[in-house]
């Protein structure tokens, strides 16, 4: 695939207009705002930095690297083990439901784009969008580092725009937050991708509590 086309497809994967429910989930932020843990843009930035460092860098990116290698090797057994590990790291029913819902939605796109995707891989991709991204990245010859940039930007933008609705703060503040969070992400992405097996795992008790409490929150803008 020519390089310009790869770049355009990478931008398409980063777009939050993809019909995978990117704006439908708050990952506990809605309860954190309700509880008074996140009251302004500075508190949101601190909250999101913690999620990035203690969850996204500790689980999502290391597992993306392993799923990518499994897809390169055509090894669905290895991909299945890491997909199951990813789901086990989602500490609440809400987070596991989000993972599976986004995976199922992304797989519908994947099958439309690549109808030759084998059935055993489709089944795995339905469990997690991360698995689908890895498979598609290998098929489209997009490097794992470029794929990680796309995934990270989409995650950051979704979180910041959720904050616009919930905290709230304005659009100018949102763009400043995206720039600062992206700078932090870019500085640490490579080391996160190189995380050894024994170091994979997250410890975000406040985020887990917020997600669990959000399941029964009286009034919600976001899915549970």
UniProtKB/Swiss-Prot annotation:
One of the entry's Gene Ontology molecular-function terms is: nickel cation binding
Q: Which UniProt keywords apply?
A: Chaperone, Cytoplasm, Nickel insertion
Provide a GO CC annotation, any one: cytoplasm
List the InterPro entries: UreF (IPR002639), UreF_sf (IPR038277)
Keyword Nuclease belongs to the record: no
Principal location class: cytoplasm
Cellular compartments annotated? Cytoplasm
The residues forming the signal peptide are: none
Q: Which Gene3D superfamilies match?
A: Urease accessory protein UreF
What's its job? Required for maturation of urease via the functional incorporation of the urease nickel metallocenter.
Q: Which family does it belong to?
A: Belongs to the UreF family.
Record HAMAP family = UreF
Assembly and partners are described as: UreD, UreF and UreG form a complex that acts as a GTP-hydrolysis-dependent molecular chaperone, activating the urease apoprotein by helping to assemble the nickel containing metallocenter of UreC. The UreE protein probably delivers the nickel.
Q: Which PANTHER family match?
A: UREASE ACCESSORY PROTEIN F (PTHR33620:SF1)
Name of this protein: Urease accessory protein UreF
Tell me what organism the protein belongs to: Escherichia coli O157:H7
Upper taxonomic classification of the species? Answer: Bacteria, Pseudomonadati, Pseudomonadota, Gammaproteobacteria, Enterobacterales
- Gene field: ureF1
